[in-house]
Structures are given as structure tokens and as C-alpha cells.
Design a protein with these regions (language model features):
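Conserved active-site alpha-helix within GNAT-family acetyltransferase domains
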Residues: 93, 117-136, 140
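Conserved N-terminal entry element of GNAT/NAT acetyltransferase domains
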Residues: 1-11, 146-148
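Conserved acetyl-CoA-binding loop-helix of GNAT-fold acetyltransferases
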Residues: 82, 88-101, 128
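A conserved beta-turn-beta hairpin within the catalytic core of GNAT-like acetyltransferases
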Residues: 66-77, 87, 133-134
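Glycine-rich phosphate/pyrophosphate-binding loop shared by adenosine-nucleotide-utilizing enzymes
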Residues: 3, 54-60, 75
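Conserved beta-strand in the GNAT
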Residues: 50, 56-65, 81
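Active-site rim helix/loop that mediates acceptor-substrate recognition in acyltransferases
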Residues: 28-48
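Conserved GNAT acetyl-CoA-binding A-motif
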Residues: 103-115
Length: 148
């Protein structure tokens, strides 16, 4: 099958991506909340690239361009997900490569993402794509239940 890439930029397109994004972000339970958050994130520079197989979204890569003292200008990949029946097909590598190419076109210095310590298969995938583990990501919930 031939796949095409397209950035999703409106609420209808975001709605169409909801079911696939839930494969990665299962805690996002409500489509309306998801769409509203994507609208906010796009106002902050987030872009959502979709791989289409015919009329269906079969892969997503969400990312943003940032700049800091550690990396200079860089692309940060927030989300990368491929339809479960197409995993190991090369589609994830193709999406990641397309985002990396955009980073190079934008003269970014680095290409950065995080993956969970509980996801060894994802870690192996990222190593195969040429990414290296350079640190450990720490987080703390600022909700009342996270401060106890």
C-alpha cells in the first residue's frame, strides 16, 4: 500500500486522529477534550503529521520546534504511534525520518524525544533509528494527589 503524509490542522482532522492517538495515549478518554488540547498545543507550535493509508490515518507523529541552552534549536517529538497492525512495517521509521528531515530543513541542531523506561521495544526502535539515550527524564505531578 502507498502511504501519504499530511499535517493535520483543523478540528475535523484532529477528530479523525483520536482513535489512533489513544493507542499511545490511552489516558485521553474524551474526543472533545483531545481536540481542544490539540487546538491549544498547535497555538504553541505543536504539529501533528499523519500517515494516511487510503482514507484512514495509520500513523501519527506529533512534534514541536523549541530552543534551549542545552540543545539550541531542536525538534522535540511528543507523540509517535502507528496502527498496531502496521507496527514493524517501517511506517514508524518513515514518520520519524520525515520529522527529522523537517528538523534539518529548519536548521535545528538536535532531534529529541523521550520514551518510557517501561517500553524496551520502543527504546530498541529508537536506537535503530540512530537516537541515543543521553539522560533521564524526571517528572513530578503538581496535582494534589501527586504531592502526597
Amino acid at each position: 500500500m502507498t502511504y501519504t503524509l499530511q499535517h493535520l490542522e483543523d478540528k475535523e482532522a484532529f477528530q479523525a486522529s483520536f482513535d489512533l492517538m489513544r493507542v499511545l495515549r490511552s489516558h485521553v478518554a474524551n474526543q472533545a477534550t483531545y481536540v481542544a488540547q490539540l487546538v491549544r498545543q498547535t497555538q504553541q507550535g505543536y504539529r501533528l503529521m499523519a500517515a494516511w493509508g487510503g482514507e484512514h490515518i495509520v500513523g501519527l507523529a506529533g512534534y514541536r520546534e523549541l530552543e534551549n541552552l542545552l540543545y539550541g534549536r531542536f525538534i522535540y517529538v511528543d507523540d509517535l504511534v502507528v496502527s498496531p497492525d502496521l507496527q514493524h512495517s517501517g511506517l514508524g521509521a518513515w514518520l520519524l525520518s520525515a520529522v527529522r528531515e523537517e528538523a534539518m530543513q529548519r536548521s535545528c541542531d538536535h532531534f529529541v524525544l523521550d520514551t518510557g523506561l517501561h517500553m524496551p521495544l520502543a527504546q530498541r526502535f529508537y536506537f535503530r533509528q540512530g537516537l541515543l539515550a543521553r539522560g533521564m527524564h524526571f517528572t513530578q505531578s503538581l496535582r494534589a494527589e501527586g504531592l502526597a
